[in-house]
Amino acid sequence: MSFHSFYQRASSLFKAYPSTSKILLLSTFSGGGGVLVYSDSNPLKRILHADATLDSDGNPIRKKKVVVLGSGWSGYSFLSYLNNPNYDVQVVSPRNFFLFTPLLPSVTNGTVEARSIVEPIRGLMRKKGFEYKEAECVKIDASNKKIHCRSKEGSSLKGTTEFDMDYDILILAVGAKPNTFNTPGVEEHAYFLKEAEDALNIRHSVIDCFERASLPNLTEEERKKILHFVVVGGGPTGVEFSAELHDFLVQDVAKIYPKVQEFTKITLLEAGDHILNMFDKRITAFAEEKFQRDGIDLKTGSMVVGVTADEISTKERETGKIVSEPYGMVVWSTGIGSRPVIKDFMQQIGQGQRRVLATDEWLRVEGCDGVYALGDTATINQRRVMEDIAAIFNKADKGNTGTLKKKDFNSVVKDICQRYPQVELYLKKNKLKNIANLLKSANGEDTQVNIEKFKQALSEVDSQMKNLPATAQVASQQGKYLAKCFNKMEKCEKKPEGPLRFRGEGRHRFQPFRYRHFGSFAPLGGEQTAAELPGDWVSIGHSSQWLWYSVYASKLVSWRTRMLVISDWTRRFVFGRDSSSI
């Protein structure tokens, strides 16, 4: 190519670009000392889109904008596993760190420092090439695919603190807020245990109670009131906090505040019949017996009806009477509810009558395209087998004979189990090897079944449907699952890998989310922990405590946090807990 033809070609390309691009190119060419290389594949496009992902023709691919709300278990897990260069990822969260929430009760009494269980999110953002904004989403405009954000409360930034963001895909991972059940006085007078700030506030309050009770000129009744600690809720959080607080009283308070130790009291209130009712009955029984031996006042069947600055009132189920009791501090851990931004979003998309935001089995928000919800933010609305029973039968009955042979049924067995996880749960509960055994039990020795026998065989399967627990384990698995789906989005669009569509043609793009339970722990104090592991395996005692140490240390998200937490545990063993209020 001659210099003249090169000049004409370059000139025409130059004129085709906007003025800002021309300025950039002129600045580059006029800087001197550079090398100008010509290529027939459009050199200006290569210069302007050097960092962009290009298609086979060299054209830049527009990246889909993925906005992630939240930096908790599900959000952090999603961001950690996402590896697809075709997404422009923006993260919005008022918390610029990931918090290892299972160790929050240990922060309340100084066993572990708060800084030891947080991992700054900026490191992950830098590593992945994502952008982060420290702000809170206060409004979701689903129809226009926008979110309205406000900078973190208490920010000292001057000027506007609000901004809007567009999105192509929205990931809701904002978690949940404590549920007070509209009980009067709870918001004003009780402490919660959801954030690092909550744990630190409880820690300071506990120390302040002992310092106030140590002051002179107080009556015995006043000291008893100040040192009465009430925990509302007999779930894992309430039980673990009660156990941690009892250990602090026995192991540290006796040395630090010997004159007031005799006035301390811990009361655990539970509206149900038992504490830890989601665990094996053996664990529940052991926990209740241990708390009674430890002197923790366990009251089941007690529903809190009001909290004032000085008293907590409960309604006793057996007698129906309302009893009021003075207290020094109340910790509330009775469950979770949707955040205001999620409630408003639910109204927009027709889910206003629901208690929790609903998604399908692929974590897509029902009634709103391009929005996913993870963790405590939502619950999976698992489709029932009986809703699709006729479609399943017709899909298997390829010859339209009105009956199914074993061969016909076997062709869709795998897809049924993948699409409806409750089928597998039902088989395990009834000790059946496969669905064929289920059909046999309903049809006797017949080799064929009609639609009525088919319905009869599967009629009880949906009884095994249950909501997933609001735990870190579930949230983390959901984040990882969704990230892996995004990583292979383009591949699965061409070659779907999910189960058959019983209503319609083809297959679902991905396998639906399937939760795998790896076990649960319930620390009970005194270096004893209850462990419930898959396979109906229960372990209680000191050995389970060491298993708890090893599992939690391994689940921390970085070596930095592992080293800090292990050093905190070591410090506690050697020197005791930190009782300072800073």
From Swiss-Prot:
It holds the Pfam family Pyr_redox_2. Residues 1-39 form a transit peptide. Disruption phenotype: Lower reactive oxygen species formation and altered phenotype (e.g. growth rate, root:shoot ratios and leaf area). Lower leaf area early in development followed by a prompt subsequent increase in leaf area leading to larger leaves in mature plants. Better tolerance to salinity stress. These phenotypes are probably due to an enhanced expression of NDB2 and AOX. No effect of calcium ions on activity. Residues 384-419 form the EF-hand domain. Belongs to the NADH dehydrogenase family. This is External alternative NAD(P)H-ubiquinone oxidoreductase B4, mitochondrial. The gene is NDB4.
